[in-house]
Amino acid sequence: YLLSAAREMNRNLIRTAYSTIIYEVKDFGVGIYDNQCRLLAEAPGLAIFTRGNDYALKQIVQYLGHENIHPEDIILLNYPYMSAAHTLDVTAAAPIFHDDKLVGFSAVKQHWKDLGQKDPGYCTDTTDVYQEGLLIPCLKIHKRGVLNQDLVELIRFNSRMPENTLGDMNAKISSCITGRKRVEELIDKFGQETYNLAVENILDHGERIARVQLADLPKGTWSAEDWVDD
């Protein structure tokens, strides 16, 4: 069911995004996480994004504190030293609550085309992070379900393509809300205890598979080289 929910997040994002880099290039990652920011389910996308989101989620919790994360919040983060990505890869996180207790997050990391960086599009010759555009350090775009219009306007006035940027932002928000609702429905149906047991089973199963694969590797020291365009 969690995989199905993640795939639904994926479909909603693709169907509602404004940018070709989302609905054609698939430059995004979506996932569902537990309350320790451990990945439980992901949909097809850039795996590095989904892996980076757990780090971003931990930074959000550390920055805001558990006491300042509330039901129906949605938090944006793109500060590279907290989000494990460059500035244009923006994380949105929706905390998931049951009986007023944080049980997890749904999250989307997605490339935005323009946040006022020094050059339109990609700028590969920047010399510091401040040339990459607007920095968003764990700010709430939704506060207890209420849209933060001040932050919307800040983003609007810092983008050369505001309609496109805000359209992609809304697609991301919708995707996060989808994941949040599906997990809430799951817990309502089966109960918190059953959900917690299922989460631990998922993580234990993943660890067992990884250990089996590692055990098949021959003993030795391994290294590799590869090349990228200059």
Task: Please identify what each model-predicted range represents.
Residues D89-D99, A107:
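A short, hydrophobic, proline-anchored segment that marks a local hinge/packing element in signaling
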Residues L135-I209:
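N-terminal leader/propeptide and maturation segments of large enzyme subunits in energy/redox metabolism
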Residues K26-L77, I187-D230:
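Gly/Pro-rich turn-and-neighbor structural signature
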Residues Y1-V25, V61, G65, L77-S83:
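Short, basic/aromatic recognition patches
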Residues Y1-T16, Q36-F49, K172, E184:
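Extended, highly charged
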Residues S83-D89, L115-G116:
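Short, Lys/Arg- and Gly-enriched loop/turn segments at beta-strand edges
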Residues L102-N158:
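Gly/Pro-rich active-site capping loops and adjacent beta-alpha segments
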Residues E24-D27, L88-V90:
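Short, small/polar residue-rich loop motifs at catalytic or cofactor-binding pockets
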